Structures are given as structure tokens and as C-alpha cells.
Design a protein with these regions (language model features):
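The feature encodes the CheY-like receiver
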Residues: 16, 58, 76, 88
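Conserved acidic carboxylate
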Residues: 10
Length: 151
């Protein structure tokens, strides 16, 4: 079984501790950091499988940290889920442009967070998809209305 180590970078002590407890109860192994600099130090000692990162941090912004990580020869392959109180297409685009792999708006449902994290770690392993003929597609039937990030 692959590691479920996750680096949670969140400056709010209450939210950081709460996320740590919830993620632990869901089978994840959280590493907690309150700042960008602390996150960089912890990455060197305990490389995670995925990063959940607030975009507003006290020292290095989440945008700056994502840019640093995506340029790093070792850490650039670690998926980053951006968490921000800003919502909408502009916020999403800004996070993705900085190098984040996905985006979630605060507040969020734990089930949505868990689904996003699972998708990110699953996406690490490339899968070959072979299409042998025309597919019937029902985009309305595939939509999960409980996911606010779903179009």
C-alpha cells in the first residue's frame, strides 16, 4: 500500500490541528506546518505524498511556495491542493498558474477534501486508457452535485 503521508500547511492553529485530527481518523498520516518556511524544512525530512496548502501564509505566500516547489527537482512531482477562502474562476486560475494541481474553497466538506486528495494521489500513477469505439456520454449523469467544484 502506498503512503498516505500528507503535509498540511495552514497558519490557523485551530484549523491546522482540526485537519490533522480529521485526516488521521480517515487513514492519512499528516505532517503539520504553520508557515511556508516550516513546510520547506519538513519537506526535506519527511517528503509527503500530497500537500494541502492554505494560500495565505504569514511568511511565504502559498502562491510563492507552490512556485518554489514546482521548480525543485525532487518536490516538483508532489501534488498540491490549494485551499483558499477566495472562490471563483479567478482564484482557481491563480492557484493553478502558481503550480497547484487542484483547488478547494474554504469552507469545504471533508468528503470533498478527501475525494480531491484521493484523486491527486491516484493521478500520480499514469494510466493508459484505450478507446475502442464511440462512447455514450451523459455529462449530467456523471455530475456529482454534492461537489461544489464540479461543473
Amino acid at each position: 500500500m502506498l503512503s498516505k503521508k500528507i503535509l498540511v500547511v495552514e497558519d490557523s492553529c485551530h484549523l491546522r490541528e482540526l485537519l490533522g485530527k480529521i485526516l488521521t481518523s480517515r487513514g492519512w498520516d499528516p505532517i503539520l506546518a504553520e508557515s511556508g518556511r516550516e513546510a520547506l524544512a519538513k519537506l526535506e525530512c519527511q517528503p509527503p505524498r500530497v500537500i494541502l496548502m492554505d494560500m495565505r501564509l504569514p511568511d511565504i505566500s502559498g502562491f510563492g511556495l507552490a512556485t518554489i516547489l514546482k521548480k525543485h527537482p525532487v518536490h516538483r512531482s508532489i501534488p498540491i491542493l490549494a485551499a483558499t477562502a477566495s472562490a471563483g474562476d479567478l482564484a482557481r486560475q491563480r492557484c493553478l498558474s502558481a503550480g497547484c494541481d487542484d483547488f478547494i474553497s474554504k469552507p469545504f466538506a471533508i468528503s470533498v477534501l478527501e475525494r480531491r486528495l484521493t484523486n491527486l494521489v491516484s493521478a500520480e500513477t499514469p494510466k493508459t486508457i484505450v478507446v475502442t469505439g464511440p462512447r455514450k456520454c451523459d455529462p449530467i449523469g456523471e455530475k456529482d452535485s454534492s461537489d461544489p467544484g464540479c461543473w
